Amino acid sequence: MIYQAETLQVKEVQDGIAELSFCSPKSVNKLDLATLESLDKALDALKAHQGLKGLMLTSDKDAFIVGADITEFLGLFAKTDAELDQWLQFANSIFNKLEDLPVPTISVLKGHTLGGGCECVLATDMRIGDKTTSIGLPETKLGIMPGFGGCVRLPRVIGADSAMEVITQGKACRADEALKIGLLDAVVDSDALYESALKTLTSAINEKLDWQARRKQKTSPLTLSKLESMMSFTMAKGLVAQKAGPHYPAPMTAVITIEEGARFARNEALDIERKHFVKLAKSEEAKSLVGLFLNDQYIKGLAKKSAKSASKDTQRAAVLGAGIMGGGIAYQSALKGVPVLMKDIAQPSLDLGMTEASKLLNKRLSRGRIDGFKMAGILASITPSLHYTGIEESDVIVEAVVENPKVKAAVLSEVESHVGEDTVITSNTSTIPINLLAKSLKRPENFCGMHFFNPVHRMPLVEIIRGEHTSDETINRVVAYAAKMGKSPIVVNDCPGFFVNRVLFPYFGGFSMLLRDGADFTKIDKIMERKFGWPMGPAYLLDVVGIDTAHHAQAVMAQGFPERMGKQGRDAIDALFEASKYGQKNGSGFYSYTIDRKGKPKKTFSEEILPVLADVCTDKQDFDDQTIIQRMMIPMINEVVLCLQEGIIATPQEADMTLVYGLGFPPFRGGVFRYLDSVGIAEFVAMAKQYSELGAMYQVPQMLIDMAAKGESFYGAQQQGSI
């Protein structure tokens, strides 16, 4: 043994050939701070080893290295610029040490080789993988960019254009793709991987492969003419500006880093990369996006815990109510390996549900994500039925009939009589209280809400609603089933609108009040999309949700929270509803809609909306951008905080993920609680007080007032990790 540490070891495997194997005692290999320090010492031991002729990098896991340890990021990023720069210099010196070994080096890859793992293998002379290899640099998705030499080495290995595409898109390349662009030198069968790597390394040792020329190319300036350079970087900047936009600076910074470093040799180019990395690492966007990643891991951890605690795994499911929603739920369940009975009282609805499932499967087939055999198997695992026969075999029932309390109660009571005593029954409802629906059941402890979002196959969130009688076992089984479906389940307590709709409608309330006071809805949409970062402004979102749906939900919310959400008079939603302007579904709402060549609705402004709004709005008044953002966001933020204060949602992490996954809250802002930390709670309280005369929706919750007085934040404890 040449060197041994907890997460890696080095031994001589053949005459003069050493193998450095990453072998963490945990389930995956990560380049955490401790592993980097061990790698540094291992390379020192290799340099001192007599008779070294070549080095192989391997992993004892199915994935080579999944990346750096992201849980350490926020702690690192909280350091001063100088401390972070110093640490990056140390990290880069390790990879330089690997790259500068006086012998040829090869990385032997399988599974994920991502982020820091990819940057590590770029420092070796050659890379060989099997067909499971997935290699890339996803850092820009976290608001940062490669900081261990990825912006320097990748362009010199695969060319500037391909490197900018991989880095700016945060892409992981499949083995065949990586081979095509030169990121891998060879792809072989898994059982031949080790021997092929040894053979390749031996060829390099025997000078049949010019490893020194490869190394020289990686440590020299990029070979681009002035014209090539200008064309490459100008085009890349244009594409990135169009795709990433102003709220996500990391992709553009990566392009600038590659451009600035192109004319320098490795060490000077690394200095440039370091400078830009530090700037990104200190940004609010990086803090938010890394925070979201950590929150996502937290939610996945909770789901795993629930699955372990559940006494029974869901092997079969049933959906009551077909159509688009029922078909979408059935498709998602079947796709993830849980056969499903889809029951409806009408054959046309069953046909629609099966058509929806077939359409979604055909899309996957046309994109090469499944083959015909797999598609047929998935479709066959959805059983459409007009009867309850066979439903007794289901472990979980998802009721997805029309949003009407009487109809739902009748269906729930009926299905309960057809299933076993330990069958879990859920209701896919967006507004009807779970405690109300539970009254129709003999076993309310086996019942909870399971709120899917439309379109089911695309929306990652499922809101799991706990009623006052719901048992922990029921929650655990439903959370485990949602996770099995590939969804992110968030458990909330029952209240009008649950969490998502409860916090959305004060936002719509702020919108209605702005219109009442003379604001232009097209300007509000523009500001909330371009400046704040929502995917859709409130008027457009209402059109997509459906004005009739929003009108109904608004009445439910007003009844549930009369003090904050009760209305003094008619508003814009009432006016559009009364004029039968329901939005996209009938071609006319705040905007008018036509169907484009791809069959998608295209919105345009039409003056016919103006007389409809005239009697609920005062004369036109211009509001500045900041006022619009504040008047729109304060009611939502207050309601989110009240939900935490009242225990409707358990943690800031779960609330923020729900907002991002369920409502499209701008990821670069990280959710309401991350946003409050970023703005400063005391600053938010002072700002909100300026609008207190607008009514109860603008009154700051006591929790925020108390936290502001104590100088507290919601995510203070997440700033961990040390250099």
UniProtKB/Swiss-Prot annotation:
Annotated residues for binding of NAD(+): 325, 344, 401-403, 408, 430, 454
Swiss-Prot/TrEMBL site (Important for catalytic activity) positions: 119, 139
Pathway stated in the Swiss-Prot or TrEMBL entry: Lipid metabolism; fatty acid beta-oxidation
Superkingdom of the organism of origin: Bacteria
HAMAP family the UniProt entry points to: FadB (MF_01621)
Summary of subunit composition and partner proteins: Heterotetramer of two alpha chains (FadB) and two beta chains (FadA).
Name of the protein: Fatty acid oxidation complex subunit alpha
Gene encoding the protein: fadB
